[in-house]
Swiss-Prot record:
Its main location: membrane. This is ATP synthase subunit alpha. It is an enzyme of class 7 (translocase). ATP binds at G169, D170, R171, Q172, I173, G174, K175, T176. One of its GO terms (cellular component) is proton-transporting ATP synthase complex. It comes from Francisella philomiragia subsp. philomiragia (strain ATCC 25017 / CCUG 19701 / FSC 153 / O#319-036). It is found in: Cell inner membrane.
């Protein structure tokens, strides 16, 4: 078979027409060392701080150290297959995670990949993990309550939507229990919740998922898990990933609550990464920017105004404010709140709930110390009825603590002192609350009203909890309309006070407990 010259030239012309002569520019570097999840790369002149670097085997690294002739990056995943001499490439992208409604009810890792065995997450939205917090001009003051359903918190240390309230205390004294109760209490309120587990056992996270599912709270919750077996890099970025997921709701005029459990372990992970990157250590071997590690995260929790939401959504959402409330958790060692990380986070947040081991061991749970606990902005957001009735509770407890110490040495006490001690004991007993037994505004108001107006004074201390249970049961069965009215309005006036008085006196008269 012979081809004519014209056929040959035709074939060549077709090949030339189909030839792709576009040039793809790649910034390429060589890996010179890999150890403990840290790679040092020679080259990559165009890399920027925080950029994702493509490594062999579909693994990415995060550029953290930019030196004159090399780049120090932390590997986000498995690094055993990476060896000296392998190539690394710039991507021109910073780390992003999937965000949106599709993540609700799911358990994801620090990169947003599902780890609950329920298939892929279908979402069209993604967001960078590092974002600049809204400026002062876009913020709105905190004036809406975020009810936790816990008597001692909502009455004495109220939390507002858009606030940062630290939960601080030693290990195993109920810090996570408070956060989980707060998430469960948001059921039916429209508040979306994100729970970020940092450096915890996988079994503990599985237990939390089970508890949330049992109480119907998983439907409005995203769980971001960086377990103890995950690399330090994933534990370091997990809070930022969770925060981006919460900002999705905040920026669209919705309310969100995020729990960081706990930021002590994130600081440990960041310290490990920094020391491996040969950054100079400072106090307690932490790097110099450990304050910025937490401040840039917690400043993203805010209440934003209508203009911000309208501008962000290009006019699709109008007249709505958005909020992201943060509950960071810090673990102390032997109650030492003057250590480096606790003092940093206390100075960043808008208040703290301080839990004490001695109170926990004495049976007071939640073990909140009302003297050390404070909410700097929550008072303006507190529900009116709880604010009015809760003031006497804090005063009664403060007087009780002072007199209790004095009464141990004094043998003869006058009637007024004895009365204050008796009331303090009963108020302390009233503030005990089991986990998963959060209260509505109306039921909490009933308990506070009974304590504030001396209805508990005639009871034995052991009768306080049974009386409260009977009071709540009576209110829900016989006075359901009053309960619904208080839950809806949250107001307090002479008429509401009279209704509360009727319910409490009815319960005392029946002695149903």
């Amino acid at each position: 078979m012979q081809l004519s010259p014209s056929e040959i030239s035709g074939l060549i012309k077709k090949r030339i027409e189909k030839f792709d002569n576009s040039v793809e520019l790649k910034s390429e570097g060589s890996i010179v060392s890999v150890a403990d999840g840290i790679v040092t790369i020679y080259g990559l002149d165009d890399v920027t701080a925080g950029e994702m670097i493509k490594l062999p085997g579909d693994v990415y690294g995060l550029a953290l150290n930019l030196n004159t002739d090399s780049v120090g990056a932390v590997v986000l995943g498995d690094y055993e297959h990476i060896k000296e001499g392998d190539k690394a490439y710039c991507t021109g992208r910073i780390l992003e995670v999937p965000v949106g409604e599709a993540l609700l009810g799911r358990v994801v890792d620090a990169l947003g990949n599902p780890i609950d065995g329920r298939g892929e997450i279908e979402t069209a939205h993604s967001s960078p993990i590092e974002k600049i917090a809204p400026g002062v001009i876009w913020r709105k003051s905190v004036d809406q309550a975020l009810q936790t359903g816990i008597k001692s918190i909502d009455s004495m240390v109220p939390i507002g939507r858009g606030q940062r309230e630290l939960i601080i205390g030693d290990r195993q004294i109920g810090k996570t229990a408070i956060a989980i109760d707060a998430i469960i209490n948001q059921k039916g309120t429209g508040v979306k919740c994100i729970y970020v587990a940092i450096g915890q056992k996988a079994s503990s996270i599985a237990n939390i998922v089970r508890q949330l599912e049992e109480h119907g709270a998983m439907e409005h919750t995203i769980i971001v898990a960086a377990t103890a077996s995950d690399s330090a890099a994933l534990q370091y970025i997990a809070p930022y990933a969770g925060c981006s997921m919460g900002e999705y709701f905040r920026d669209r005029g919705e309310d969100a609550l995020i729990v960081y459990d706990d930021l002590t372990k994130q600081a440990w992970a960041y310290r490990q990464i920094s020391l491996l990157l040969r950054r100079p250590p400072g106090r307690e071997a932490y790097p110099g920017d450990v304050f910025y590690l937490h401040s840039r995260l917690l400043e993203r929790a805010a209440r934003v105004n209508e203009e911000y939401v309208e501008r962000f959504t290009n006019g699709e959402v109008k007249g709505k404010t958005g909020s992201l409330t943060a509950l960071p958790i810090i673990e102390t060692q032997a109650g030492d709140i003057s250590a480096f990380v606790p003092t940093n986070v206390i100075s960043i947040t808008d208040g703290q709930i301080f839990l004490e081991t001695d109170l926990f061991n004495s049976g007071l749970r939640p073990a909140i110390n009302p003297g050390n606990s404070v909410s700097r902005v929550g008072g303006a957001a507190q529900t009116k009825i709880i604010k009015k009735l809760g003031g006497g509770i804090r005063l009664a407890l403060a007087q009780f603590r002072e007199l209790e110490a004095f009464s141990q040495f004094a043998s003869d006490l006058d009637e007024a002192t004895r009365s204050q001690l008796n009331r303090g004991q009963r108020v302390t007993e009233l503030l005990k609350q089991k986990q998963f037994s959060t209260l509505s505004i109306a039921l909490m108001a009933l308990s506070l009203y009974a304590a504030d107006n001396g209805y508990l004074d005639s009871l034995e201390v052991s009768e306080v909890i049974p009386f409260e249970s009977a009071l709540h049961a009576l209110a829900e069965n016989k006075y359901a309309e009053v309960v619904a009215e208080i839950n809806e309005t949250g107001k307090y006036d002479a008429e509401i006070a009279e209704k509360l008085k009727t319910i409490v006196e009815d319960c005392k008269a029946n002695q149903a407990w």
